[in-house]
Swiss-Prot record:
It comes from Mycobacterium tuberculosis (strain ATCC 25618 / H37Rv). This is Uncharacterized formamidopyrimidine-DNA glycosylase-like protein. PANTHER family: FORMAMIDOPYRIMIDINE-DNA GLYCOSYLASE (PTHR22993:SF9). GO terms for molecular function: DNA-(apurinic or apyrimidinic site) endonuclease activity; endonuclease activity; hydrolase activity, hydrolyzing N-glycosyl compounds; nucleic acid binding; zinc ion binding. GO terms for biological process: cellular response to oxidative stress; DNA repair; nucleotide-excision repair. The keyword Protein biosynthesis does not apply.
Length: 158
C-alpha cells in the first residue's frame, strides 16, 4: 500500500513501482521473469497466480530472461502489473474471507485454466510443472506459438 513502510526483507510494493523502477530492479538479472517477479525480495505482492496473469496480459514468456526485456516489454510488464493487481484489489473490496478465493478465480484468464481456451486468442492454455511449482500460459499470446518444455518428468528420466 502506498505510504506504508516496507519491512526490509521485502522489495517495493508492485503497485508502487514506476516503469523506471521496474527497469532498475530487473537490470542485469539473469533469472527467468516468472521467478524474478514472484521473488518478494525483488518486488513485493506478486504471487504465482497473479504472475501468470501479468505475464499473459504483457504477452511475455515466463521463461524470458528478466534483464533482457526490451523497453517496450518493460512498459507492457509495468502496465500489466498495474492493471491486473488494481483489478484484483477492486474485485476483492467488500468481499468476506469465505468469498475471496472464488472472487480471485473469477478474474483469472490463464492461471488454473490448463486445457481451456485462452480468452484472448482461443488457443489451449498450457501448463509447465517443475519441482513443486507450476505455471500456466498461452503459447500463442506469450511464446509465439511455441510450447514450453514441461519439466515434470525430467527428474525421473535421469
Amino acid at each position: 500500500m502506498a505510504g506504508t513502510p516496507q519491512p526490509r526483507a521485502l522489495g517495493p510494493d508492485a503497485l508502487d513501482v514506476s516503469t523506471d523502477d521496474l527497469a532498475g530492479l530487473l537490470a542485469g538479472n539473469t533469472g527467468r521473469i516468472k521467478t524474478v517477479i514472484t521473488d518478494q525480495k525483488v518486488i513485493a505482492g506478486i504471487g504465482n497466480a497473479y504472475s501468470d496473469e501479468i505475464l499473459h496480459v504483457a504477452k511475455i514468456s515466463p521463461f524470458a530472461t528478466a534483464g533482457k526485456l526490451s523497453g517496450a516489454q518493460l512498459t507492457c510488464l509495468h502496465e500489466a502489473m498495474a492493471s491486473v493487481l488494481s483489478d484484483a484489489v477492486r474485485r476483492s473490496v467488500g468481499q468476506g474471507a469465505a468469498m475471496l478465493k472464488g472472487e480471485k478465480r473469477s478474474g483469472l484468464r490463464v492461471h488454473a485454466r490448463t486445457g481451456l481456451p485462452c480468452p484472448v486468442c482461443g488457443d489451449t492454455v498450457r501448463e509447465v510443472s517443475f519441482a513443486d511449482k507450476s505455471f500456466q500460459y498461452c503459447p500463442t499470446c506469450q511464446t509465439g506459438g511455441k510450447a514450453l518444455a514441461d519439466r515434470r518428468m525430467s527428474r525421473l528420466l535421469k
